[in-house]
């Protein structure tokens, strides 16, 4: 006689739905197909993805980066906004490898959850595919992990991995930066994917609702605006101006104060002008609602500057003009100076 303890069990009984996983793959394949580019030999579906480095690179150096979206995901869950965090995921990695002069070639993602919702996962991957299109890289693989008991229902985690290439002679390392060079800032779309633990704390203090009006837009649209992807615009500037662009910094966790020093040699400092750009209304509101000090704002948030370029002074106007042609909002936000005793490597004055 069979009892409940000897009845046949299935993977579905344990909480893993193979059919849902297969359905998701079917939804993903056409999304990934839109991102294909020359060089992809084997994409989604194989045990490993294959990519041939473009022949235009004479001495190719591969540049890799990996990242997540951080606690911005908490708001995605709470506010049911899943279609843009995939763009964030791509942006965080491709912008990171861009700063060394690399052209992103391909991207892979990791999506982990406790119970797979095909619709939610497809919305996330749709954002990833859109991010890859914006960056010009191929979505050639990924992993979807349904792990019962590991995540609450409706929640998930994301990680992404980007690989790009740059000619060895064209690697940007900041070593040629010198006093007198100009610091240009490219506008961000908002908080991007950093500082969201503080953002959430301020939203809680303010009693904010996702549907409340914020200067003519729903607050959710402003707070969840996807991270800007600067790849095509900056690559166009590098192609035209080459060595005039001496350093690039992606302004992520640590804000301006911690990220700009990462491209400076000892003895160099970036002196940024507080009035060199207008801090967007979102950051003004966050600072006011949270009573956040200026220094804390500059070391947590991008404060409206998502990418920094250090360029030769005599080429600054030309580089800025090229970036504006590509649709960028460009501000001249400071200059490189000799670092004085006791001076931080990046200061806002």
Curated annotation (Swiss-Prot):
Source species, domain of life: Bacteria
Q: Which PANTHER family match?
A: TRIFUNCTIONAL PURINE BIOSYNTHETIC PROTEIN ADENOSINE-3, TRIFUNCTIONAL PURINE BIOSYNTHETIC PROTEIN ADENOSINE-3-RELATED
Q: What does the UniProt entry say about where the protein is found?
A: Cytoplasm
Please write the reaction equations for the catalytic activity of this protein: 2-formamido-N(1)-(5-O-phospho-beta-D-ribosyl)acetamidine + ATP = 5-amino-1-(5-phospho-beta-D-ribosyl)imidazole + ADP + phosphate + H(+)
Q: What are the recorded GO MF terms, alphabetically?
A: ATP binding; phosphoribosylamine-glycine ligase activity; phosphoribosylformylglycinamidine cyclo-ligase activity
Q: Extract the NCBIfam families matched here.
A: purM
Q: Which family does it belong to?
A: Belongs to the AIR synthase family.
Write down any Gene Ontology CC term. cytosol
Q: List the disulfide bonds.
A: none
What's this protein's name? Phosphoribosylformylglycinamidine cyclo-ligase
Q: Which Gene3D superfamilies match?
A: PurM-like C-terminal domain, PurM-like, N-terminal domain
Q: What biological-process GO terms show up in the record?
A: 'de novo' IMP biosynthetic process; adenine biosynthetic process
- Indicate yes or no for the key word Ligase: yes
Question: What keywords would UniProt list here?
Answer: ATP-binding, Cytoplasm, Ligase, Nucleotide-binding, Purine biosynthesis
| Entry EC number(s) | 6.3.3.1
């Amino acid at each position: 006689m069979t009892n409940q303890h000897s009845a046949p069990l299935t993977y579905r009984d344990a909480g893993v739905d193979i059919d849902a996983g297969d359905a998701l793959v079917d939804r993903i394949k056409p999304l990934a197909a839109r991102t294909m580019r020359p060089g992809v030999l084997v994409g989604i579906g194989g045990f490993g993805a294959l990519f041939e480095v473009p022949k235009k690179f004479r001495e190719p150096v591969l540049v890799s980066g990996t990242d997540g979206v951080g606690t911005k995901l908490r708001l995605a869950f709470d506010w049911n906004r899943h279609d843009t965090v995939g763009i964030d995921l791509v942006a965080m990695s491709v912008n990171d490898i861009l700063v060394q002069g690399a052209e992103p070639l391909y991207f892979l993602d990791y999506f982990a959850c406790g119970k797979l919702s095909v619709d939610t996962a497809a919305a996330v991957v749709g954002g990833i595919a859109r991010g890859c299109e914006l960056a010009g890289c191929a979505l050639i693989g990924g992993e979807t992990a349904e792990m019962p008991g590991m995540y609450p229902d409706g929640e998930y985690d994301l990680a992404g991995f980007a690989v790009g290439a740059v000619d060895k002679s064209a690697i940007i390392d900041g070593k040629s930066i010198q006093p007198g060079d100009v610091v240009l800032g490219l506008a961000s779309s908002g908080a991007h994917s950093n500082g969201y633990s503080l953002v959430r704390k301020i939203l809680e203090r303010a009693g904010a609702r996702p549907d409340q009006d914020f200067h003519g837009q729903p607050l959710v649209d402003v707070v969840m605006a996807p991270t800007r992807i600067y790849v095509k615009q900056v690559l166009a500037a590098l192609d035209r101006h080459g060595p005039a662009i001496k350093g690039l910094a992606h302004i992520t966790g640590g804000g301006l104060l911690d990220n700009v020093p990462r491209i400076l040699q000892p003895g160099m400092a970036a002196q940024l002008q507080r009035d060199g750009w207008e801090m967007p209304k979102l950051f003004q509101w966050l600072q006011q609602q949270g009573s956040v000090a200026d220094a804390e704002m500059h070391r947590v948030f991008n404060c409206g500057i998502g990418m920094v370029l250090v360029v030769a002074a005599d080429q600054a106007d030309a580089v800025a003009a090229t970036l504006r042609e590509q649709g960028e909002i460009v501000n001249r936000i400071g200059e490189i100076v000799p670092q004085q005793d006791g001076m931080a490597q990046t200061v806002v004055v």
